[in-house]
């Protein structure tokens, strides 16, 4: 006997009252006290017809079938793949409204999770919203039914690769060549052995790193070289872990970007972490240094420093700066970049900041101010170990409002700091990702 549907999939009309933290519309079709329904593709204030797609204990999920009354902030998505590809979720919302929404998510998270409110809300930072992604990873899959290779981000259903020919958020040197890249992979003998391609862009060079599960034939290597020559793209191969990455073409290449306001150049490797949005990154650094307010006579501790994205600009403006990072490769590059830029007042240490560091040499040094830029999980482990009373000011750059709110709760409600200011930064336009910056002062 055929399996019965577990819930009623009949379409119905509803009004959208809010936007969720992941970019979906929020409806309460059963009234104020009823279960919430998250609606993909809907915006606040809209009246829509929706089709249920999933039912959960505490909430339901649906998708828009028809918009009966559109929001004045609704715009036509630039990408024809919007709604299928998971790379963007907010292209149907005007760009200024996206930023307002992210600012709201940030403030709501601080209040709801951290039980804190800032004295001042900083104007949100934004930069170029198209062609900004200078680092990313495309999935690759040969699809027998289509008879061709798909290259792109995953669909919202992560089992599938989005069938795209162009991506408007990726740097044009890569985003406009996805179809050509797919054609190249179609021609390879080992087309089924390439699961992903990573891209990264410096100021002068764009690089692709081709991950392959089996050794590539000489013909395949030559095809990749010809593609690199034709389009001016450096080609790297990766047969295993990060340590297996090798340059295929050209014979030598220098991946680098310069932060002109501080006359600092960063040299990096193809799989290194760099901030995805170069234009916003420069604004963010200037904003963070201005908020930190550290001068030539002061010592600054920079945690989760990576390549030294904040550390090296800080070294131009303060007496001494110490950067701490868990990735030994990034620390090696940070030290080398400090030497290349003649910054002898920047020192770097390798440390896993999720573990006990109370006996680490840098932990015993004295500092005036603290800057930190942790991963999504936040910084609670290291914050609980630091002698926080030595810091006059803390500037916290966050990539997740939930972990920032948790850490703000600790700093304000347990350690007695004051949350002076906070603001969103639109590092990832057209996505629901919320980057932010917060300023804490010692009482």
Swiss-Prot record:
Its EC number is 2.1.1.190. Keywords: 4Fe-4S, Iron, Iron-sulfur, Metal-binding, Methyltransferase, rRNA processing, S-adenosyl-L-methionine, Transferase. Residues 4-66 form the TRAM domain. The active site is at 399 (nucleophile). It catalyses: uridine(1939) in 23S rRNA + S-adenosyl-L-methionine = 5-methyluridine(1939) in 23S rRNA + S-adenosyl-L-homocysteine + H(+). SUPFAM superfamilies: Nucleic acid-binding proteins, S-adenosyl-L-methionine-dependent methyltransferases. One of its GO terms (biological process) is rRNA base methylation. The keyword Cell membrane does not apply. It is an enzyme of class 2 (transferase). One of its GO terms (molecular function) is iron ion binding. S-adenosyl-L-methionine binds at residues 275, 304, 309, 325, 352, 373. [4Fe-4S] cluster binds at residues 79, 85, 88, 167. InterPro entries: 23S_rRNA_MeTrfase_RlmD, MeTrfase_TrmA_AS, MeTrfase_TrmA_CS, NA-bd_OB-fold, SAM-dependent_MTases_sf, TRAM_dom, U5_MeTrfase_fam. PROSITE patterns: SAM_MT_RNA_M5U, TRAM, TRMA_1, TRMA_2. Gene3D superfamilies: 2.40.50.1070, Nucleic acid-binding proteins, Vaccinia Virus protein VP39. Catalyzes the formation of 5-methyl-uridine at position 1939 (m5U1939) in 23S rRNA. Belongs to the class I-like SAM-binding methyltransferase superfamily. RNA M5U methyltransferase family. RlmD subfamily. This is 23S rRNA (uracil(1939)-C(5))-methyltransferase RlmD. The lineage of its organism: Bacteria, Pseudomonadati, Pseudomonadota, Gammaproteobacteria, Lysobacterales.
């Amino acid at each position: 006997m055929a399996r019965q549907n577990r819930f009623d999939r009949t379409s119905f009309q509803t009004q959208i009252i809010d936007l969720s933290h992941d970019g979906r519309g929020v409806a309460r079709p059963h009234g104020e006290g009823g279960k919430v329904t998250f609606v993909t593709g809907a915006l606040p204030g809209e009246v829509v017809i929706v089709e249920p797609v999933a039912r959960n204990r505490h909430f339901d999920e649906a998708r828009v079938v028809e918009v009966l009354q559109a929001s004045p902030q609704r715009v036509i998505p630039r990408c024809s793949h919007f709604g299928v590809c998971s790379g963007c979720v907010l292209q149907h919302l005007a760009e200024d409204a996206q930023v307002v929404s992210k600012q709201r998510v940030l403030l709501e998270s601080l209040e709801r999770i951290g039980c804190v409110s800032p004295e001042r809300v900083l104007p949100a930072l934004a930069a170029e919203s198209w062609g900004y992604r200078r680092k990313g990873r495309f999935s690759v899959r040969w699809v027998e039914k289509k008879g061709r290779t798909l290259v792109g981000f995953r669909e919202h259903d992560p089992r599938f690769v989005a069938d795209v020919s162009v991506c408007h958020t990726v740097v044009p040197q890569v985003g406009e060549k996805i179809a050509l890249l797919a054609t190249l992979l179609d021609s390879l003998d080992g087309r089924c052995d390439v699961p992903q391609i990573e891209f990264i862009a410096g100021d002068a060079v764009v690089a692709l790193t081709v991950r392959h599960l089996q050794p590539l034939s000489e013909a395949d290597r030559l095809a990749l070289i010809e593609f690199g020559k034709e389009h001016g793209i450096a080609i790297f191969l990766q047969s295993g872990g990060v340590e297996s990455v090798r340059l295929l073409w050209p014979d030598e290449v220098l991946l680098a970007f310069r932060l002109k306001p501080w006359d600092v150049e960063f040299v990096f490797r193809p799989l290194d972490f760099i901030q995805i949005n170069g234009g916003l990154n420069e604004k963010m650094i200037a904003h963070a240094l201005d908020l930190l307010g550290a001068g030539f006579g002061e010592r600054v501790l920079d945690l989760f420093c990576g390549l030294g994205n904040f550390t090296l600009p800080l070294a131009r403006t303060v007496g001494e700066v110490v950067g701490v990072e868990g990735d030994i490769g990034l620390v090696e590059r940070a030290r080398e970049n400090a030497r290349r830029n003649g910054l002898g007042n920047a020192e770097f240490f390798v440390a896993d900041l999720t573990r006990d560091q109370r006996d680490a040499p840098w932990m015993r040094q004295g500092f005036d101010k603290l800057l930190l830029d942790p991963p999504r999980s936040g910084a609670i482990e290291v914050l609980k170990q630091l002698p926080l009373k030595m810091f006059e000011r803390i500037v916290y750059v966050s990539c997740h409002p939930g972990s920032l709110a948790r850490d703000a709760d600790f700093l304000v409600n347990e350690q007695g700091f004051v949350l002076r200011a906070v603001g969103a930064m639109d590092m990832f336009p057209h996505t629901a990702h919320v980057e932010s910056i917060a300023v804490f002062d010692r009482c």
